[in-house]
């Protein structure tokens, strides 16, 4: 019995060794086939990596979008606010002018940037209350949007106000359609009141905020033209110094 088991084990071992030799001979005799299989495996791996990478690129997160409006701003004084190609800010009786169309871009809670659609310039107010235009979005381009009575809206500087009283400085037009100094415009006067006339809803990229110290400034605090910024004080024209009417 024991001898039969032993001979059976020896036979099984011999058969196993023969199978191993046979497999080794096959591998040696057909190296090109093995190489081909290896190449196929490599291609499969690379294709999977490439496919994974392409899927990853397609899944890029979209840039943040802000929902604003393209609108006209009708002053209670009887003019449409307009921003002319030379940077002049004033009022126009003609409603059809493309210079009277603005992008109102939300940049905070009840805070907007006012940008001319035609010129791509931002409205801004400096530390002396003067309105000017800028190619770049800075803290001086931020205006607080407040709803007044009868659906009129006021726009006041977010960073400048009267030092002692704390009274806000407002965007305003006088009876002649001239832009006024912000510290001469009062909230309860028609000069400060604008009625938005929305044309359509639009999606905007969030403007890149530039620091004011990046730009050269004159002694009066009025932005001046430089290589990095175009700041124009009402297109070089005079502004109304009278109190709001």
From Swiss-Prot:
This is Fibroblast growth factor 13. GO terms for biological process: establishment of neuroblast polarity; head development; inhibitory synapse assembly; microtubule polymerization; negative regulation of collateral sprouting; negative regulation of microtubule depolymerization; neurogenesis; neuron differentiation. GO terms for cellular component: axon; cytoplasm; dendrite; filopodium; growth cone; microtubule; neuron projection; nucleus. SUPFAM superfamilies: Cytokine (SSF50353). It comes from the Eukaryota. Microtubule-binding protein which directly binds tubulin and is involved in both polymerization and stabilization of microtubules. Through its action on microtubules, may participate in the refinement of axons by negatively regulating axonal and leading processes branching. Plays a crucial role in neuron polarization and migration. Regulates voltage-gated sodium channel transport and function. Required for proper head development, it is involved in neural differentiation through regulation of the mek5-erk5 pathway. It is found in: Cell projection, Filopodium; Cell projection, Growth cone; Cell projection, Dendrite; Cell membrane, Sarcolemma.
């Amino acid at each position: 019995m024991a001898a039969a088991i032993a001979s059976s084990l020896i036979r099984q071992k011999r058969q196993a060794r023969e199978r191993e030799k046979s497999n080794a001979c096959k591998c040696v005799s057909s190296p090109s086939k093995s190489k081909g299989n290896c190449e196929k495996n490599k291609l499969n791996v690379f294709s999977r990596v490439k496919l994974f990478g392409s899927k990853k690129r397609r899944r890029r997160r979209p840039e943040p979008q802000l929902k604003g409006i393209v609108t006209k701003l009708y002053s209670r004084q009887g003019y449409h606010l307009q921003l002319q190609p030379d940077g002049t800010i004033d009022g126009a009786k003609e409603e059809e002018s493309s210079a009277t169309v603005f992008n109102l871009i939300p940049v905070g809670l009840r805070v907007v940037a006012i940008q001319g659609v035609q010129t791509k310039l931002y409205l801004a107010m400096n530390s002396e209350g003067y309105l000017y235009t800028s190619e770049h979005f800075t803290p001086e381009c931020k205006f607080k949007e407040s709803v007044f009575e009868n659906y009129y809206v006021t726009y006041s500087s977010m960073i400048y106000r009267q030092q002692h009283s704390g009274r806000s400085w407002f965007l305003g037009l006088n009876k002649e359609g001239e832009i006024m100094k912000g510290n001469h415009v009062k909230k309860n006067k028609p000069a400060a009141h604008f009625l938005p006339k929305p044309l359509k809803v639009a999606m905007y990229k969030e403007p890149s905020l530039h620091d004011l110290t990046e730009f050269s400034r004159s002694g009066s605090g009025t932005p001046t033209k430089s290589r990095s910024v175009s700041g124009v004080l009402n297109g070089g024209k005079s502004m109304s110094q009278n109190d709001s009417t």
